[in-house]
Amino acid sequence: MSRKGTRSDRKHIAMERISILFSQAESFFSWNQEYSHHCVRSARLIAMKERVRIPPWLRRRYCRRCNAYLVPGVTGRVRIYRGRVIITCLTCGWHRRIPTTRSTTTNGKEKK
């Protein structure tokens, strides 16, 4: 049995489902953290199956190792160290390092 719909339709539907699952993970986190982790796992499975990239602002909200939904101060720690934002998962201890960019050069003029 073949898949119905074009590639762009399936990609669009997958992105909608991923964003819905992340919003559910955020809203249910205070009541049930395991359900939030399940939503993240489901969103990642959808992205892998349809070969869709999860947007960067959503990628920073989960742990790649244990699929935990990261909330700063509860399941994740956010620190700035040597020009990087370091996000640490408090469930498994995994670190994500995100470089920060500067908008000006060393002499104070803006980059173009």
From Swiss-Prot:
Q: Which organism is it from?
A: Methanospirillum hungatei JF-1 (strain ATCC 27890 / DSM 864 / NBRC 100397 / JF-1)
Give the quaternary structure. Consists of a catalytic RNA component and at least 4-5 protein subunits.
Key words, A-Z:
Cytoplasm, Endonuclease, Hydrolase, Metal-binding, Nuclease, tRNA processing, Zinc
Q: Name one GO molecular function term.
A: ribonuclease P activity
Broad class of the protein's primary localization:
cytoplasm
The cofactors it requires, by name, are:
Zn(2+)
Q: Could you tell me what this protein is called?
A: Ribonuclease P protein component 4
| Cofactor binding description | Binds 1 zinc ion per subunit.
Query: Which reactions is this enzyme annotated as catalysing?
Result: Endonucleolytic cleavage of RNA, removing 5'-extranucleotides from tRNA precursor
Q: Does the keyword Chloroplast apply?
A: no
Q: Which GO terms describe its cellular component?
A: cytoplasm; ribonuclease P complex
Location in the cell reads: Cytoplasm
- Function statement: Part of ribonuclease P, a protein complex that generates mature tRNA molecules by cleaving their 5'-ends.
What Gene Ontology biological process does one annotation of this record name? tRNA 5'-leader removal
Give the binding site residues for Zn(2+): C63, C66, C89, C92
- InterPro entries noted in UniProt: RNP4, Rpr2/Snm1/Rpp21
EC number(s) for this protein?
3.1.26.5
One matching Pfam family is: Rpr2
